[in-house]
């Protein structure tokens, strides 16, 4: 099985863009890119796959990733790398790289996540990011000054990072949470969240959980789904 056949077997859909090298694969957070690459490495042990981001794989296999970008024919998180002419496929979650001049138009896409659930997927869709899920989860929006954090705290901007530090919270910045997954998360945002105020940092924070996410903002009405 070649990589294109594997993509299609995992519900990655071809776009109308004519194929050209490198073939670009875009997927929402939690769509299973790492599992896809591990499966391909199992089928094709000679595959040379590169990622610039440390991976936390649950696979019993040794990591399929090579340390050499120059020898890779598949590159994950490609906006972080300088691509050489021999690269066959490149992959990324494009929303994590909003505004990057290195984003390419995709030949394959997957808007379905296996990480979080319907409530978060519907919320992301309301923010303009088409997302689907196969399971339930819980999303709560509450006031940052009236609600205790639950699970891993992710502070999305300087104001909330300073607030978290003053309260001695064990928090992560969004960039520190890339490649990580938690059962429950609380994300701190210093402003109202809507399509106009959504940033890649907030998107990253919104997509780290498997069970529940609590969004804390100033003066937010308490809602849950």
From Swiss-Prot:
Annotated keywords: Host cytoplasm, Host-virus interaction, Inhibition of host innate immune response by virus, RNA-binding, Suppressor of RNA silencing, Transport, Viral immunoevasion, Viral movement protein
Subcellular location, record wording: Host cytoplasm
Entry keyword RNA-binding: yes
Stored InterPro entries: (+)RNA_virus_helicase_core_dom
Domain (+)RNA virus helicase ATP-binding: 1-110
Any one GO CC term of the record: host cell cytoplasm
GO biological processes: symbiont-mediated suppression of host innate immune response; transport of virus in host, cell to cell
Pfam families on file: Viral_helicase1
An MF annotation (GO) of this entry: ATP binding
Domain spans labelled (+)RNA virus helicase C-terminal: 111-225
PROSITE patterns tied to this protein: PSRV_HELICASE
Domain of life of the native organism: Viruses
Primary location class: host cell
Known partners and oligomeric status: Homodimer and homooligomer. Interacts with capsid protein. Interacts with host AGO1; this interaction targets the host protein for degradation, thereby suppressing the antiviral RNA silencing.
Extra remark: TGBp1, TGBp2 and TGBp3 seem to act together for cell-to-cell propagation. TGBp1 is the main movement protein that physically cross the plasmodesma with the viral genome. TGBp2 and TGBp3 would facilitate TGBp1 function.
Family indicated by similarity: Belongs to the Tymovirales TGBp1 protein family.
Function per UniProt: Transports viral genome to neighboring plant cells directly through plasmosdesmata, without any budding. The movement protein allows efficient cell to cell propagation, by bypassing the host cell wall barrier. Increases plasmodesma size exclusion limit. Acts as a suppressor of RNA-mediated gene silencing, also known as post-transcriptional gene silencing (PTGS), a mechanism of plant viral defense that limits the accumulation of viral RNAs.
Name of the protein in question: Movement and silencing protein TGBp1
Organism expressing this protein natively: Indian citrus ringspot virus (isolate Kinnow mandarin/India/K1/1996)
Lineage: Viruses, Riboviria, Orthornavirae, Kitrinoviricota, Alsuviricetes
